């Protein structure tokens, strides 16, 4: 009887989710209540976790709690530590929930809310959550090894080396785009810059406090840090109101790029306890707390989505990012649905913390469910804005101009009527000098959050504080990711350099570490600076490259797991990773090809393609006589050439992994030939 009632309850959940999703898809009015989205997502995620993740865990992967995990076998109290699954879940979620799920859906909102909602809900349950879960499983069974090491073990030395180069390149692109989100949010914002600058001495104070005064008191020091952050936000308001102080803390995007490069270099070579660890503690508590409060606030306020279900920009003519709904929506949403970056975390610190194999279900699948919830919240923050305001914030200067009146006129001509006065009013409410062309997603999310708080409190004067609180919230954990990413990429560079000159691979060598860090910062710093001087705002051209590379990394990780499952003889079960891999790689190969096709009569494709842009720039260079304009064109030509070369390189790496994966799987299925042999660690019974 009880079993029947439970079954009926799940049937009800499924029907309710289908109805709510149907309403979102078929609604024809000007706006729709966000509660439909909240209920639909809750139902779909619940069903996905309860049934699909259970099927994967116990029918395909066959998780075994009697088998000792790497954390138990190699428990050293430092890197390998068996940890409660709730704590591991928090650590893993904090590590994967970077800028991607906030920025991608906000950019994709230019096409309307429906395409993003469908891809986030369906793609995450069947693809992204599976990806994180199965990569974590593979690493647990291989002594907590990294993605590159596992590819080397399961596919061969040569493939592993090439894949490691590709992974490093992708890592540098990821760090650059993360840093760019912060730069775009803080440019010309003395309030924002002052607040973020204050987080450095606050984090150092926390590090010293924990190191010398109150060791291991993480909660205590995080509360102190949070109080100091709130004080810094309030102080930032008065800095922005004082003309002299405001001028001191106001910077151009290009200047901020150099500052973040310097910060990234110094932070990554300092002891972890001094800056990185306290920032991590603070950003983790802040991240989980803000996301939890935002979910409750959205349910309480239930603001209407004002952005249309589908906009005219599905054809790729939109100003926010280049490309049509297929394939570029998929790579733009990126981390909100599936992210190759997560494979680096699922094969990094997390597998060294799991106390039981069954914990991988909650940590791997469950954390990605939470990340896709964050993506939906970001979409809500963009969707509740007046569409004209959304495009005023996210369109590059070259599309709408510098003047508010001109911007309002251009945006209104697109069919999203907005007045200059409405833009000025929002600018005043959030305490900024301008909101035009604040590309990168972070300002949009911050304004959306501030509006939700305003609807609760009913006082527009609170919007400025909450806007800057949201900017702080985003910048804090993005900078933490930049710190950690630079440090991780440094290790990858030293590992590769060690194959050429052994002393450079010595992780204990201070000089080798500094040299590798310089190479790393120069790598991601180039792309960051390129984005800050790009006339289209950087995000317009760089985010698609980030999306392509990130999704290709996810595809390679899924291919690795498919190879592992074929070697284990679980041919039918391997479809859980093989099918998403085929879909993701098909989308990314297609989008990658579109980014290197030559110039044509199709203006949308010309905007997408780096090669087409090179041809267009070359034509302009032939007719330009102004020396300054010519130098700008030459820089732009070179940047597009680098982007095109990287895109081709990433595709070749993914193609190599695909070909080798197909060969290994074919041999396993048709010839029962397992080579290279399965690299799973021997079974050790858990104590």
Swiss-Prot record:
Its main location: membrane. One of its GO terms (biological process) is cellular response to starvation. InterPro entries: CstA (IPR051605), CstA_N (IPR003706). The keyword Protein biosynthesis does not apply. The keyword Protein biosynthesis does not apply. Keywords: Cell inner membrane, Cell membrane, Membrane, Peptide transport, Protein transport, Transmembrane, Transmembrane helix, Transport. The chain crosses the membrane at residues 6-26, 29-49, 87-107, 117-137, 162-182, 190-210, 221-241, 256-276, 285-305, 325-345, 373-393, 440-460, 462-482, 513-533, 546-566, 574-594, 642-662. PANTHER family: INNER MEMBRANE PEPTIDE TRANSPORTER (PTHR30252), PYRUVATE_PROTON SYMPORTER BTST (PTHR30252:SF3). It comes from Helicobacter pylori (strain ATCC 700392 / 26695) (Campylobacter pylori). Belongs to the peptide transporter carbon starvation (CstA) (TC 2.A.114) family. This is Peptide transporter CstA. It comes from the Bacteria. One of its GO terms (cellular component) is plasma membrane. The lineage of its organism: Bacteria, Pseudomonadati, Campylobacterota, Epsilonproteobacteria, Campylobacterales. It is found in: Cell inner membrane. It is a multi-pass membrane protein. Involved in peptide utilization.
């Amino acid at each position: 009887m009880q079993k029947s009632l439970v079954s009926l309850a799940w049937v009800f959940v499924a029907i309710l989710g289908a109805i709510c999703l149907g309403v979102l898809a078929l609604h024809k009015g000007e706006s729709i209540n966000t509660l439909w989205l909240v209920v639909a997502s809750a139902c779909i995620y619940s069903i996905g976790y309860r049934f699909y993740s259970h099927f994967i865990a116990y029918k395909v992967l066959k998780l075994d709690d009697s088998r000792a995990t790497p954390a138990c076998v190699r428990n050293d109290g430092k890197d390998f530590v068996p940890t409660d699954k709730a704590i591991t879940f928090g650590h893993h979620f904090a590590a994967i929930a970077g800028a991607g799920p906030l920025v991608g859906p906000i950019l994709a909102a230019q096409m309307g809310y429906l395409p993003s909602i469908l891809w986030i809900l369906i793609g995450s349950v069947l693809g992204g959550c599976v990806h994180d879960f199965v990569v974590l499983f593979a690493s647990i069974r291989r002594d907590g090894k990294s993605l590159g090491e596992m590819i080397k073990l399961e596919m061969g030395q040569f493939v592993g080396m090439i894949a490691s180069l590709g992974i490093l390149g992708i890592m540098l692109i990821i760090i650059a785009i993360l840093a760019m989100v912060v730069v775009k949010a803080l440019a010309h914002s003395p309030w924002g810059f002052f607040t973020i600058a204050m987080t450095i001495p606050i984090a150092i104070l926390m590090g010293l406090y924990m190191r010398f005064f109150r060791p291991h008191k993480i909660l205590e020091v995080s509360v102190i840090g949070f109080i100091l952050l709130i004080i810094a936000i309030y102080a930032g308001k008065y800095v922005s109101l004082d003309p002299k102080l405001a001028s001191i803390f106001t910077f151009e995007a290009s200047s901020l790029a150099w500052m973040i490069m310097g910060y990234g270099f110094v932070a990554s070579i300092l002891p972890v306890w001094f800056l990185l660890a306290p920032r991590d503690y603070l950003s983790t508590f802040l991240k989980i707390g803000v996301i939890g409060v935002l979910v409750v606030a959205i349910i309480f306020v239930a603001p209407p989505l004002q952005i249309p279900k589908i906009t005219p920009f599905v054809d790729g003519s939109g100003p926010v990012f280049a490309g049509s709904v297929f394939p570029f929506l998929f790579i733009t949403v990126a981390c909100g649905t599936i992210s190759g970056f997560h494979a680096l975390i699922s094969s990094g610190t997390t597998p060294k913390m799991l106390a039981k194999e069954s914990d991988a279900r909650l940590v791997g699948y469950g954390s990605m469910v939470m990340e896709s919830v964050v993506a939906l919240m970001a979409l809500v923050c963009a969707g509740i804005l007046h569409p004209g305001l959304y495009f005023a914030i996210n369109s590059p200067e070259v599309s709408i101009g510098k003047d508010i009146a001109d911007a309002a006129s251009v945006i209104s001509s697109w069919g999203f009527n907005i007045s200059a006065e409405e833009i000025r009013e929002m600018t005043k409410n959030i305490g900024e000098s301008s909101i035009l062309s604040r590309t990168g997603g972070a300002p949009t999310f911050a304004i959306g959050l501030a509006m939700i708080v305003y609807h609760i409190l009913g006082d527009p004067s609170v919007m400025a504080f909450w806007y800057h609180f949201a900017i702080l919230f985003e910048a804090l954990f993005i900078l933490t990711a930049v710190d950690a990413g630079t440090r991780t990429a440094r290790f990858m560079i030293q590992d590769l350099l060690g194959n050429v000159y052994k002393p450079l691979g010595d992780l204990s060598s201070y000089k080798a570490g500094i040299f590798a860090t310089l190479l790393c910062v120069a790598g991601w710093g180039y792309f960051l600076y390129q984005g800050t001087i790009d006339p289209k705002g950087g995000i317009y051209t760089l985010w698609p490259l980030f999306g392509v590379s990130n999704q290709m990394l996810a595809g390679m990780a899924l291919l690795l797991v498919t190879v592992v499952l074929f070697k284990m003889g679980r041919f039918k079960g391997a479809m859980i990773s093989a099918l998403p891999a085929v879909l993701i790689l098909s989308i990314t190969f297609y989008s990658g090809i579109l980014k290197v096709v030559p110039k044509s009569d199709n203006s949308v494709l010309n905007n997408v393609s780096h090669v087409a842009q090179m041809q267009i720039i070359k034509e302009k260079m032939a007719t330009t006589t102004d020396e300054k304009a010519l130098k700008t064109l030459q820089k732009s030509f070179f940047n597009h050439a680098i982007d095109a070369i990287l895109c081709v390189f990433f595709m070749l790496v993914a193609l190599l992994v695909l070909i080798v994966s197909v060969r290994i799987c074919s041999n396993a299925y048709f010839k029962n030939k397992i080579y290279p042999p399965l690299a799973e660690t021997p079974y050790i019974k858990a104590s």
